[in-house]
């Protein structure tokens, strides 16, 4: 654990002491080195139950893929932000990268934590840098509104979790995951226990987000700068799914009956948010709603609590993290050139930027879960689990996949195909930096296709 945590903490003096000329290249290189070191975790993830580096930080097959994703994302965020942060004063540039690095530190400690209370503190700590990034570097004035939504939804959701954890500590005497998974199941019988069960899960369902408590997500995504959107889509939503998987161990006997309404909401959310996507005009908003739809599938897979459901959920979380982050980067490159997020105003970009159209195409196909890609693997596993649990769910999940394919192709056709409007003739060309950024997002997705067992979680 420390082989990644210490270099990440060493990023802070690097950011503040590097000469302005070398700031971006140094931090990107440093971030990529950390990302490469973090890949060594994947090697051991499947053989051992829990590779413990200390009593408080450990990595097991469930957290390892998410830790790798977190480390992989920092250099990509730095690469993506370079264009629109460079004109600002050097102090602000340093502060921006510091916030991104602090976010990575908190996330590594959240995914590696063995104590649930440590996980909770880090889960909450990620809120602060994200909030500053959205409200300080967002594009429109609505960013303050988005920040308020984000703050209040997350805080209101996670306060019951704190109370629930303190109660669990009181009854069990420990909050260590290493001990809790071997302790006796709790005899949860009364109404109070049912409220406690809901308190444990509601924070994660708001973070996922479950349909119904998802309103903060489109706002936060649309108003955040590109790095904010990337880290929000790729890792912060996955904190919710990861936390649910960890807590399910403790909540066992009650989940059988109480999970029903949440599964129904998640499945209904797949259809509803997909339908909203079909009517979107705003590029980033469409990608944000598609995230809600995918995470609904993940929530359903986790709440059913079968090995296949868990495996499908973690595969879909990793694949969706890379793909939605790539889509946000592409949306940002289009926004930086045309200064508009409305899809109708920027059509026919394939004629001007053919290689970028290829990146759009791959990202959209991955988003709609094209066969050999890991997205399909995760979705199929979850859909199979849901079908096994109740055959009627195939109506909802089947319609959901159909709508997903519909809006993904709609997004591609609207932004890339069609006649090029007269007002977009003199656009600056794409940089190698942007092509590298897209390659670093999409090549891992294609490579995971060849060895999916590194992200199968416990079930391998």
Swiss-Prot record:
Keywords from the named record: Electron transport, Membrane, Mitochondrion, NAD, Respiratory chain, Translocase, Transmembrane, Transmembrane helix, Transport, Ubiquinone
Main location: mitochondrion
GO function terms (MF aspect): NADH dehydrogenase (ubiquinone) activity; ubiquinone binding
Catalytic activity: a ubiquinone + NADH + 5 H(+)(in) = a ubiquinol + NAD(+) + 4 H(+)(out)
InterPro entries named among the record's database cross-references: NADH4_N, NADH_Q_OxRdtase_chainM/4, NADH_UbQ_OxRdtase, ND/Mrp_TM
A Pfam family: Proton_antipo_M
Gene Ontology CC annotations of this record: mitochondrial membrane
Keyword Transmembrane helix (UniProt): yes
Function of the molecule: Core subunit of the mitochondrial membrane respiratory chain NADH dehydrogenase (Complex I) that is believed to belong to the minimal assembly required for catalysis. Complex I functions in the transfer of electrons from NADH to the respiratory chain. The immediate electron acceptor for the enzyme is believed to be ubiquinone.
Name of the molecule in the record: NADH-ubiquinone oxidoreductase chain 4
Organism: Formosania lacustris
Gene designation: MT-ND4
């Amino acid at each position: 654990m420390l082989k990644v945590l210490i270099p990440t903490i060493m990023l802070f003096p690097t950011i503040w002491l590097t000469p302005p000329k070398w700031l971006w290249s140094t931090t990107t290189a440093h971030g990529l080195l950390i990302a490469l070191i973090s890949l060594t975790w994947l090697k051991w993830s499947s053989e051992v139950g829990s590779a413990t580096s200390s009593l408080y930080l450990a990595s097991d097959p469930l957290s390892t893929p998410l830790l790798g994703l977190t480390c992989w994302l920092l250099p990509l965020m730095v690469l993506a932000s370079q264009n629109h942060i460079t004109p600002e004063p050097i102090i602000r540039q340093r502060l921006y990268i510091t916030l991104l690095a602090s976010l990575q530190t908190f996330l590594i400690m959240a995914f590696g934590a063995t104590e649930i209370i440590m996980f909770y503190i880090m889960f909450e700590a990620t809120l602060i840098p994200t909030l500053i990034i959205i409200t300080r570097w967002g594009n429109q004035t609505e960013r303050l509104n988005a920040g308020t939504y984000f703050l209040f939804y997350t805080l209101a959701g996670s306060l019951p979790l704190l109370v629930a954890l303190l109660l669990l500590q009181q009854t069990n005497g420990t909050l260590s995951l290493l001990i809790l998974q071997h302790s006796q199941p709790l005899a949860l019988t009364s109404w109070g226990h049912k409220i406690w069960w809901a308190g444990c899960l509601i924070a994660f369902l708001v973070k996922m987000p479950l349909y119904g408590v998802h309103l903060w997500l489109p706002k936060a995504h649309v108003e955040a700068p590109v790095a904010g959107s990337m880290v929000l889509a790729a890792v912060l939503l996955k904190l919710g799914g990861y936390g649910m998987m960890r807590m399910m161990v403790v909540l066992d006997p009650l989940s059988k009956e109480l999970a029903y309404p949440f599964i129904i909401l998640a499945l209904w959310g797949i259809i509803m948010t997909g339908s909203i996507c079909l009517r979107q005009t705003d590029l980033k908003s469409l990608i944000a709603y598609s995230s809600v739809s995918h995470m609904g599938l993940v929530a359903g897979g986790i709440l059913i609590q079968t090995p296949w459901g868990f495996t499908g959920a973690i595969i879909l979380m990793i694949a969706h993290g890379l793909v939605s982050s790539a889509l946000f980067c592409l949306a940002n490159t289009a926004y930086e050139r045309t200064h508009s997020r409305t899809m109708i105003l920027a059509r026919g970009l394939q004629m001007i930027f053919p290689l970028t159209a290829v990146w759009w195409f791959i990202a959209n196909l991955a988003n709609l879960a094209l066969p050999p890609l890991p997205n399909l693997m995760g979705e199929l596993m979850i859909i199979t689990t849901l079908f096994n649990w109740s055959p009627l769910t195939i109506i909802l999940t089947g319609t959901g996949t159909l709508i997903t394919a519909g809006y993904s192709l709609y997004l591609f056709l609207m932004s890339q195909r069609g006649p090029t409007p007269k007002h977009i003739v003199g656009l600056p060309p794409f940089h190698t930096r942007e092509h590298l950024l897209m390659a670093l997002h999409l090549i891992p997705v294609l490579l995971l296709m060849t060895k999916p067992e590194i992200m199968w979680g416990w079930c391998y």
